């Protein structure tokens, strides 16, 4: 829990070493946070960028994620062409997205897939400023 000037928020993260096989679901994580901290605004650090609908249904305020490396290959005015698992034209490839009261910020990141070179997709580090 972070606190500043009497305002509190939860900063939580998803443990995701082997993907969905061994990580908590967004619902499980949201239930644990609510039980421990009540209904505080929550910033979720989540590796996977393709679950915005689930994050929003759980009531997370802000989700910071990556995973798709910006779509690996990018074209101007089109965006990412190839996503995780070979998904063609991933929707949440880079940028800011809204669903209900949830804001998801997706970074293109610094790394690359082991078997693919990044084309038209410069590495990216984001600075996110929170304002009340």
Please place each PLM-identified region on the residue numbering.
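Soluble catalytic domains of enzymes that build or remodel membrane lipids, polysaccharides, and related
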Residues: 1-132
């Amino acid at each position: 829990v972070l606190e500043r000037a009497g305002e509190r928020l939860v900063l939580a993260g998803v443990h995701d070493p082997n993907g969905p096989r061994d990580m908590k679901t967004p619902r499980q994580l949201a239930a644990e946070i609510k039980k421990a901290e009540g209904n505080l605004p929550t910033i979720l650090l989540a590796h996977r960028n393709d679950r915005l609908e689930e994050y929003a249904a759980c009531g997370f305020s802000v989700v910071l994620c990556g995973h798709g490396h910006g779509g690996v290959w990018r074209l101007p005015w089109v965006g990412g062409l190839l996503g995780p698992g070979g998904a063609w034209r991933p929707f949440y490839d880079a940028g800011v997205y809204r669903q209900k009261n949830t804001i998801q910020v997706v970074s293109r990141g610094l790394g690359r897939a082991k078997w693919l070179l990044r084309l038209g997709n410069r590495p990216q580090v984001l600075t996110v400023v929170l304002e009340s």
